[in-house]
């Protein structure tokens, strides 16, 4: 049996009523058959306020009766050195050895 100390107290809701939005599923036409497919359009300044600025990548999780949209954090820009290493990794083994030899000479390790 549950003791009074293990019962969670009610807390404030995670989503306040002022943050709720009500939408209607509309439709879009699918060319060339012009069949109706369900569509939901989201727009408004509230999107930016919620962290969904223009150009933000969004993860979409779909469950029965529930869609969860999550803004992805922007990826940090890759340094010029890392971009160069990525290019070198695509070279042939012989060319990679030449690049490694050059790096060794510049670093004074050989």
From Swiss-Prot:
The keyword DNA-binding is annotated on this UniProt entry: yes
EC number: 3.1.-.-
Any one Pfam family match given in the protein's UniProt record, by short name: SymE_toxin
Function comment: Involved in the degradation and recycling of damaged RNA. It is itself a target for degradation by the ATP-dependent protease Lon.
InterPro entries hit by this protein: SpoVT-AbrB_dom (IPR007159), Toxin_SymE-like (IPR014944), TypeI_TA_SymE (IPR020883)
Domain of life: Bacteria
GO cellular component: cytoplasm
Keywords tagged on the record: Cytoplasm, DNA-binding, Endonuclease, Hydrolase, Nuclease, RNA-binding
Location of the SpoVT-AbrB domain: 29-74
GO biological process entries: RNA metabolic process
Protein name: Endoribonuclease SymE
Family under the similarity heading: Belongs to the SymE family.
Species name: Salmonella choleraesuis (strain SC-B67)
Originating gene: symE
GO MF term set: DNA binding; RNA binding; RNA endonuclease activity
